[in-house]
Amino acid sequence: MTEQPLNEPVLGYSPGSPERNSIIQEIDRQMSETIEIPCIINGEEVYTGHTIPQVIPHNHGHILANVHLAGREEMESACSAAVDAQRSWIEIGLEERCKIFEKCADLLAGDWRMRVNASTMLNQSKTVFQAEIDLSLIHI
């Protein structure tokens, strides 16, 4: 790795705190729209037209997203693309791989922290503290 990793600060989410206000705003934003979630195959978005609704577990009347399901053709294509990607990934050196994961960790600790936490809370009916724990496990 390029440098010694540091732990992220623990956020308290107390009433009126900046992080509490941020998570509330992000939850409101995500609840205000219904998104389309395509299959991602070889880096390309694939909209199959065969969808199921993704609802909030504690509020089945609220649809967060329409998820496009993969059929046989999409599954075969995705498996083939994954095997090809594995071959490319093997050729990347350890230092470069570490940089990729460090960039992901930086995004999750920064700009994407509230977005991922809000999504976890809505899609899995978790508290903000449970979402924070899940997010920290992604860093590993």
Which role does the model predict for each range below?
Residues 49, 55, 61-138:
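Glycine-rich loop-to-alpha-helix module at the N-terminal edge of alpha/beta enzyme cores
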Residues 1-64:
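Hydrophobic face of amphipathic alpha-helices that form TPR/SEL1-like repeat modules
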